[in-house]
Amino acid sequence: MGPQARTLCLLSLLLHVLPKPGKLVENSDFHLAGDYLLGGLFTLHANVKSISHLSYLQVPKCNEFTMKVLGYNLMQAMRFAVEEINNCSSLLPGVLLGYEMVDVCYLSNNIHPGLYFLAQDDDLLPILKDYSQYMPHVVAVIGPDNSESAITVSNILSHFLIPQITYSAISDKLRDKRHFPSMLRTVPSATHHIEAMVQLMVHFQWNWIVVLVSDDDYGRENSHLLSQRLTKTSDICIAFQEVLPIPESSQVMRSEEQRQLDNILDKLRRTSARVVVVFSPELSLYSFFHEVLRWNFTGFVWIASESWAIDPVLHNLTELRHTGTFLGVTIQRVSIPGFSQFRVRRDKPGYPVPNTTNLRTTCNQDCDACLNTTKSFNNILILSGERVVYSVYSAVYAVAHALHRLLGCNRVRCTKQKVYPWQLLREIWHVNFTLLGNRLFFDQQGDMPMLLDIIQWQWDLSQNPFQSIASYSPTSKRLTYINNVSWYTPNNTVPVSMCSKSCQPGQMKKSVGLHPCCFECLDCMPGTYLNRSADEFNCLSCPGSMWSYKNDITCFQRRPTFLEWHEVPTIVVAILAALGFFSTLAILFIFWRHFQTPMVRSAGGPMCFLMLVPLLLAFGMVPVYVGPPTVFSCFCRQAFFTVCFSICLSCITVRSFQIVCVFKMARRLPSAYSFWMRYHGPYVFVAFITAIKVALVVGNMLATTINPIGRTDPDDPNIMILSCHPNYRNGLLFNTSMDLLLSVLGFSFAYMGKELPTNYNEAKFITLSMTFSFTSSISLCTFMSVHDGVLVTIMDLLVTVLNFLAIGLGYFGPKCYMILFYPERNTSAYFNSMIQGYTMRKS
């Protein structure tokens, strides 16, 4: 025997074992005969869940419990909708809808009504191989009102694909159409209710809340959904969560339950949270709120789930206004014309009983006090806007529109025929109609995307007791139109419920304890900023080209700094460079015109041009130091100038060495001198030194880079120094060290030749040039070790220009002076006489 067969056998057994009720009045509030019957499940009497009635096989008598006004109000909505449809000529013309409605007594009476709706007129549920041709007592079921009951009934009806439309069961479990294929509902799911609550709390910046839940599936599921939703954001934290004790049907708490409730209230009094979210059926809250009043709580915000958000009995506890502000999530308000009068109307003789149905009886179809009790609450029901009533009303109309299509109705008549539940279910899934200005249809999960309202409880008799303050759309998932909130606080200020006050802009959060909502605020330091949308707990560093001040929320571009033409140091250096360029050009021209003279040959002859050309190029390339650095300018700074300078120094050094060799070493080492001259020793030496310098420069560039970068000014972080690679300074120091060595060598050789003939005695000129070069290089190295920034660039440029000027004017200047102003000394005879005089002095 398969699982489905075993289920059917059990259902048949229960149908026969459960007691038979008494006689039914023909056309009562619970029954209306018709061509097609709808089943209705409503809670007319309230009984909290206890295990006492489950210990024996007996249906409880619901009229022994407290009457529930809202349940009767919803049942009247179904009766009103059926009567309205039967009186409508355009919807189901010629067809009378009937109903069978049962009081499910909240959670106590679900199985028996389900079996009653399944069975045929003989109270039998046959076991068949195929139920596609089976016609149960009703074609569809409206209700019940809570998720536990809806799931229980759906587990029975789904086997037969009987359409079941619930009007207030919001459990997300019902969205699973594999387990509940025939379940639909005219309210949004619990996920949307939770989202509306969360957006409400975020809007008012309540991030420190208390959650109280009932000890049943409703409380557990909704609190779990809330916790899941809050894990997606750190904006809201739960200070603590407690389970409310559920009293027995007598509403009298046992001592253990009283202690549990006292502990909860004590924690609530001591917590800094002022927002309390309550997920519980209204039945469990009467005792709780009486205790809240006894403890004299004030200043709280109570957020109600849909189960008690518009409960008139709780609202009737007018002293609750002193405990704080009551907000709740419920279905949108839609006024139904004529329903308020119908609700309190005495029943009139019903429609004639068609031959297609027979009168049957079931239990819990009496409520003697319902009408009178409802009349006493009629005013508050009218002012509340008949919120959930519209969900029942639209559910009946959804069945009617589906039946209208299934029967092939036109404007005047319908084709009455057998209607099987699975056929009607298929049509219900595809209904799409307008009812009282609202477009109604079912989505893929079987939910009708109705709007939700955020309501506030009011106790002013002239106002709506459940005033709408905001609206939530399940389609857009957004909360809109938040207004008209009357806070029960001094000066009508928004209550504050925060574990920690919000940080100021530019302050990061540092968690304190386990909750992300509890934190201390720390300032973001200069150079960092806070991007709250990305990370509220860490200050982010600004990119290299940007900066920020203390407590900034964004970075700004640093002010770039580099040598510019309008600056005084740049102008001074440019004048010196121009002087060097034109003087070198003049020297080059003079030496070219007097190339064959003894003065030019004694200065080095062709080697002079090897010095003058790099000097001229170096002076011409000085502008690369000015303006934003580029790859080319960095290359020139790191390579071109130092190579040119090394060529000049090596030429001077080898020239000094060669003069000393001629006069002092040629006689002692004639073969060495002959070898030196035969193989062009001076040029080999210059080439060798140049090759070493090029190798050093290339190695330095390969080890670093020649790409310009921006660096922070150590004195002002707001300034970004645009310069070459930072290791450029290290390379410059290394290159300068080699130039210092050449300067020392040149100076040494020049000093050794201080006694040479006057025309060949260049010691004082070379000493001047080398000493200046040595001093300036030492000064540059010292300056670079102490300072940074644009000053280094200025100093580097100034030293470079002065070094070249020292060579150009210090070495070549005196020779040009002699050539131009003392031509008589620029003759071979004069030079020979000077050599003879030197020889005679030495001999």
Curated annotation (Swiss-Prot):
Pfam families per record: 7tm_3, ANF_receptor, NCD3G
Extracellular side: 20-570, 628-642, 704-731, 786-789
Membrane topology, from the record: Multi-pass membrane protein
UniProt GO MF annotations: G protein-coupled receptor activity; sweet taste receptor activity; taste receptor activity
Localization per record: Cell membrane
InterPro entries xref list: ANF_lig-bd_rcpt (IPR001828), GPCR_3 (IPR000337), GPCR_3_9-Cys_dom (IPR011500), GPCR_3_9-Cys_sf (IPR038550), GPCR_3_C (IPR017978), GPCR_3_Ca_sens_rcpt-rel (IPR000068), GPCR_3_CS (IPR017979), Peripla_BP_I (IPR028082)
GO cellular component: membrane; plasma membrane; receptor complex; sweet taste receptor complex
Segments traversing the membrane: 571-591, 607-627, 643-663, 683-703, 732-752, 765-785, 790-810
Keyword presence, Translocase: no
Subunit relationships: Forms heterodimers with TAS1R3.
Protein name: Taste receptor type 1 member 2
Primary gene name: Tas1r2
